Amino acid sequence: MFIDEVIITVKAGNGGDGSAAFRREKFVQFGGPDGGDGGKGGDVIFVADSNINTLIDFKFKKLFKAQNGENGQKKQMYGKKGEDLIIKVPVGTQVRDFTTGKLILDMSVNGEQRVLLKGGKGGYGNVHFKNSIRKAPKIAEKGGEGAEIKVKLELKLLADVALVGYPSVGKSSFINKVSAANSKVGSYHFTTLEPKLGVVRLEEGKSFVIADIPGLIEGAHEGVGLGDKFLKHIERCKMIYHIVDVAEIEGRDCIEDFEKINHELKKFSEKLAGKKQIVIANKMDLIWDMEKFEKFKSYLAEKGIEIYPVSVLLNEGLKEILYKTYDMLSRIEREPLEEETDITKLLKELKIEKEDFEIIRDEEDAIVVGGRIVDDVLAKYVIGMDDESLVTFLHMMRSLGMEEALQEFGVQDGDTVKIADVEFEYFE
């Protein structure tokens, strides 16, 4: 099954907490702080793999998490680093933020590895908080939280040439003839239900890639038929083969066919309509009215579009097109890729920032202190409930501006102040 769009959530590993352990050994009276640092959380890494050609592996599993780092231990032992999460995707996969649609990663080169999210930093053990005044700190740092983001994976096939045209004009037969592709061929509409890639190999190592795009019909850009589901795969191609049934086997006019398909391309994207296009006039072996063919040829000449009469069935006229195409491709620059968004900046934009200090009175008339600074400190440190640790915590909050915020709120001597699980009476 060909799946080219999925929505998943990815999360980097959390860092392990630092340890607040103390050295306790026989004959060592004052062991001192002995807690090791936590291990770093695992990263989320995307890898482009040419052996994969669909996003079906993401159809049923929607949450992907890297491993957390392990906590630090006594004897200053570091926690083990969390294992990185490797996510393999087809070459041509774009990773976009689900909320904003911004491009984060464009996996366009086989084998490239890109870090999407970095794991949280491991927290410091209490040995880092020892100083000349605080010789036995009972405080340690929590591990940093691994970033999490909801993303849309979108596969856009990387081919040099895209085959477009109405259903049953011979696109699949063409790609099978000129490459090793194995597209299904049938005498009914929409025989090809998903894009297929084929490599055209000429002599002396010359080659290029063709994408067989499922047949388009009028109204495709609005979802008619197979709709615009696969039009995006043409966006990265350098040029277009527009295959037309000039024998008009199904009773349609070939000029109208040509105009309608180009109308659909333009409605989907001006970029598609502006791509270099050559017309392959197929089924010349079945044509009965050469006058209509000459009319079509003159019509295209007025527009400056090249036409190549061929019979795919009889293998006539194909070689000339392939060599001409190779020469043309060497002169066409691939369009520059869309600029990627810096993931660090994006995560900051998506984060809802609180005020530094958010202060209210509760139903018991106590002053409750919260806000971004409080959240950050509580998230960052493992704080013991002994007197020394609580004093250290309050000194930390005071240095970060809590007292000024309380005074601005209108705190009075004797007021009860609550911060998380800490409660105290305020005196200036």
Curated annotation (Swiss-Prot):
Its EC number is 3.6.5.-. Residues 349-428 form the OCT domain. GTP binds at residues 165-172, 190-194, 212-215, 282-285, 311-313. It comes from Fusobacterium nucleatum subsp. nucleatum (strain ATCC 25586 / DSM 15643 / BCRC 10681 / CIP 101130 / JCM 8532 / KCTC 2640 / LMG 13131 / VPI 4355). Signal peptide: none annotated. Keywords: Cytoplasm, GTP-binding, Hydrolase, Magnesium, Metal-binding, Nucleotide-binding. GO terms for biological process: ribosome biogenesis. Residues 1-158 form the Obg domain. It is an enzyme of class 3 (hydrolase). InterPro entries: G_OBG, GTP-bd, GTP-bd_Obg/CgtA, GTP-bd_prot_GTP1/OBG_C_sf, GTP1-OBG_CS, GTP1_OBG_dom, GTP1_OBG_dom_sf, OBG_GTPase. Mg(2+) binds at residues 172, 192. This is GTPase Obg. GO terms for cellular component: cytoplasm. Monomer. It is found in: Cytoplasm. GO terms for molecular function: GTP binding; GTPase activity; magnesium ion binding. An essential GTPase which binds GTP, GDP and possibly (p)ppGpp with moderate affinity, with high nucleotide exchange rates and a fairly low GTP hydrolysis rate. Plays a role in control of the cell cycle, stress response, ribosome biogenesis and in those bacteria that undergo differentiation, in morphogenesis control. Its cofactor is Mg(2+). Residues 159-330 form the OBG-type G domain. Its main location: cytoplasm. Belongs to the TRAFAC class OBG-HflX-like GTPase superfamily. OBG GTPase family.
